[in-house]
């Protein structure tokens, strides 16, 4: 490629609405331009990187035995009504009517469509296993699209769907996809972690997320630096922090705590560690034809409720936060001084694992300006229902017993799910088993955010000059910057020869023949993030030298003209082989 025949749309300034580095640099590097909120044009520079991501994804999906197809972006409402997600999905599902007033959606995902394919095309267990995948444009009507391609409304995604005759088959399909994802993100040159995760709105029984590690990541990841353990904070198991409950050492006592409604303030007033206080979270669940059930969830004062874990407790699937009126009616006092002692009405108490092992702790007295100290299980309170209902914290013991937890931020770029029969049962996608009986197929689904990968890669690879692409997804691997290409025959001949040699070796190279000043050329290609740069000039040629600089290098080095091509070829191939 020659730059004079290519579109390079670099900008000196980022748009005012760009909040994070990747959004700013993708616009400035001429990769994207905004069309509407969360919707972008992908300019030639950006599209080249997208195609490289797609190529790696396709190679690894094919290697894992998946079969590519293409499903429609527009889907009939009937399929979503069959699965039950027409009502459940919410406003992120873009719905519209055609001229016949029939309901349709723009697909945010394709479980329903692919299940429809399977139920119509797969009749026998002998046709299984099968794994279909596509690379398709999706649309989710985000309430607040932001961060460029990181949280857009329209985006490109690879989604795959496996069908098996039984759970053993599903587990094997899942393993193959998990391994394929590890290979994909390794080849993309990203620092990533695979973490145990919650299934969310997709449903199913087991899942892992793949996160690119970056300070700007929206997700908190709990991991153990001395083992392989990693999980989304929402899913990470929180072990009890007290091995055994100590015997009571204090008498229970009602204590004045005027104006101290927060655990931190109570601990400071009483001159005790925050870890001895109890935080009371009040939830409510509806009962048809009866009053709501009120729940009191007890956490240590320095811990936070994990709502996903709480929602999985029996009876709490559809909980909501209790209203102030419900709290006053049940406890006799407004929030701030609540606890399990002397409630006006019965409540269901659930204690976090750590709280269940505490002794001589402090709870609200259900009276404004008062707390009760020296409270103990068994003596002052009945033994509680015990569950893991909190988020893990840095320094907690790792669930695998091999160290302690640390927390980092991550950007989710992939997710694999074991769906089971959630969709096949709802949509009657069955096949005949070995006995001739119809059986719902076991499904898995596996997604990768193709366009999101670009933003995540930039968040992990940039400096004050611009993007620093991994070779595997750089729009170009090498840029040739001739000084005076249009004025010096020697420079032009050397540049053209080097260009031809690199092309013949299969290197993705661009020759900047625009006639720009050196400062403009260098600034453009550093902003765009091309990994390798060779500068050809009359002065260097007289000495038989070219100037080489890797995008991560602090300084340039001189290479003999006759060695320059092979040196760069070796560097590119070594990087791609990692």
Curated annotation (Swiss-Prot):
Q: What class of enzyme is it?
A: ligase
- Specify the species: Paraburkholderia xenovorans (strain LB400)
What GO MF annotations does this protein's record show? aminoacyl-tRNA deacylase activity; ATP binding; proline-tRNA ligase activity
Q: Does the keyword ATP-binding apply?
A: yes
Biological process annotations from GO: prolyl-tRNA aminoacylation
Known role: Catalyzes the attachment of proline to tRNA(Pro) in a two-step reaction: proline is first activated by ATP to form Pro-AMP and then transferred to the acceptor end of tRNA(Pro). As ProRS can inadvertently accommodate and process non-cognate amino acids such as alanine and cysteine, to avoid such errors it has two additional distinct editing activities against alanine. One activity is designated as 'pretransfer' editing and involves the tRNA(Pro)-independent hydrolysis of activated Ala-AMP.
UniProt family annotation: Belongs to the class-II aminoacyl-tRNA synthetase family. ProS type 1 subfamily.
Among HAMAP family, the record links this protein to: Pro_tRNA_synth_type1 (MF_01569)
Q: What is its EC number?
A: 6.1.1.15
Top-level taxon? Bacteria
Give the disulfide map. Answer: none
Q: How does it assemble?
A: Homodimer.
Protein known as: Proline--tRNA ligase
Let me see what the UniProt entry remarks about domains.
Answer: Consists of three domains: the N-terminal catalytic domain, the editing domain and the C-terminal anticodon-binding domain.
Subcellular localization(s) per the UniProt record: Cytoplasm
Q: List cellular component terms (GO).
A: cytosol
The alphabetical list of record keywords is: Aminoacyl-tRNA synthetase, ATP-binding, Cytoplasm, Ligase, Nucleotide-binding, Protein biosynthesis
The cross-references to Gene3D superfamilies, in alphabetical order and at most eight, read: Anticodon-binding domain (3.40.50.800), Bira Bifunctional Protein, Domain 2 (3.30.930.10), YbaK/aminoacyl-tRNA synthetase-associated domain (3.90.960.10)
Catalytic reaction(s) noted: tRNA(Pro) + L-proline + ATP = L-prolyl-tRNA(Pro) + AMP + diphosphate
